[in-house]
Amino acid sequence: MFEHVHDVPPPGAAPDWTIPQDWDAFSADEHAMWDRLFARQCAMLPGRAASAFLRGIDVLKLGRPGIPDYRELNATLMAATGWQVVAVPGLVPDDVFFDHLANRRFPAGNFIRRPDQLDYLKEPDVFHDVFGHVPMLADPVFADYMVAYGKGGLRSLGFGALHKLARLYWYTVEFGLIEEAGALRIYGAGIVSSYGESVFALDDPSPNRIGFDLLRMMRTEYRIDDFQQNYFVIPSLEHLLNVTVETDFGPLYDRLDTLSDVAIAEILPEDRVITRGTQQYARLKAGA
């Protein structure tokens, strides 16, 4: 999904790559950046974000000013679902990441974007990781899904199938949509933490919106440099968890090896198409 920078824990990091959050070291400007991003997203997410995400914001009291102090955040999160947030210096190796998830620890980058990075940065920061991901971890069903994904990720390394499983994470945890009360809502962290994509994912005619299918999703390429051209829609968090837990991924990886990848924006005859996108946004960007 992303490229990590270091192959061994950098100075000051533990063997599992965790570091102290050192909350007191964040500057007033850094706290102000969190508040600016938080206010901007929360003003437009009601009616767009999944109910589980909005509940998580309230349960975890993320509306308090400033970057959350993990000592306080984790006390509430642990009581809700047994999860905790751990600070890391940046992107960590895949096996380390999966081990954290499998043990109900979510690694969060310990820095926040600069003003000139307000709408885009290559590496996820504390706002993306905590605002985008952690509210969903307060939901028991999604919390269990993330544990299952972490355990599955560790197993995938033995199959040489990491790039296939990464697509599941990308199209659910990062850029997933959910059907709620007859409408589409956002639950993916890459969307809820992005002002532009929170609108684009639901309102723009450009992207495809396709019903969730595990095999299809794990065949589908994705892009990391702009708004998505496909969004996959789950019917419920319970469905996502059940499919993940009940699937034997070994035979699935074998089957994936016999199938070609699906190009970005391609629609298959068997797809449950909710919205067939025009792909106009991607074409305009490609021609720019």
Predicted features, each with a name:
Residues D116-Y120, P124-N242:
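A contiguous, surface-oriented mixed alpha/beta subdomain in the mid-to-C-terminal portion of proteins
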Residues M1-L137, M217, Q229-A288:
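The feature captures two recurrent sequence modes
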